[in-house]
């Protein structure tokens, strides 16, 4: 059985970080659906917060691989993944 899982992904980037469009493409390619996006800009840092939906088995509680991949991307300073609900 597959279920819908909601989560909040927060990425803090410096000036050399990827563009929002590139992040969105990575999330879409990983089969995550973005429901909402917010941005906090503070000087040279930007924090994007994405409310996402992932379809997965209830037994599969691991963090999606794309989250780890984004965390290794140059210019991304911090990553937070938190299930919602």
Per-range role (PLM):
Residues 22-30, 61-74:
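Short amphipathic alpha-helices in soluble, non-transmembrane regions
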Residues 7-9, 46-54:
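Short, hydrophobic beta-strand segments
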Residues 33-39, 67-85:
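Conserved short beta-strand edge segments in small beta-sheet-based binding/regulatory domains
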Residues 16-17, 55-60:
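Helix N-cap motif at beta-to-alpha junctions
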Residues 35-49:
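Non-transmembrane, membrane-adjacent beta-strand/coil modules in membrane-associated proteins
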Residues 1-39:
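Canonical alpha-helical transmembrane segment with a positive-inside/aromatic-interface signature
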């Amino acid at each position: 059985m597959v279920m819908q899982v909601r989560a909040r992904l927060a990425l803090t980037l410096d000036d050399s970080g990827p563009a929002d469009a590139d992040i969105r493409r990575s999330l879409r390619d990983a089969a995550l659906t973005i429901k909402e996006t917010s941005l906090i800009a503070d000087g040279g840092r930007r924090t994007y917060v994405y409310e996402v939906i992932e379809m997965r088995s209830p037994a599969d509680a691991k963090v999606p691989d794309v989250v780890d991949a984004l965390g290794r991307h140059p210019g991304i300073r911090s990553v937070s993944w938190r299930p919602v609900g």
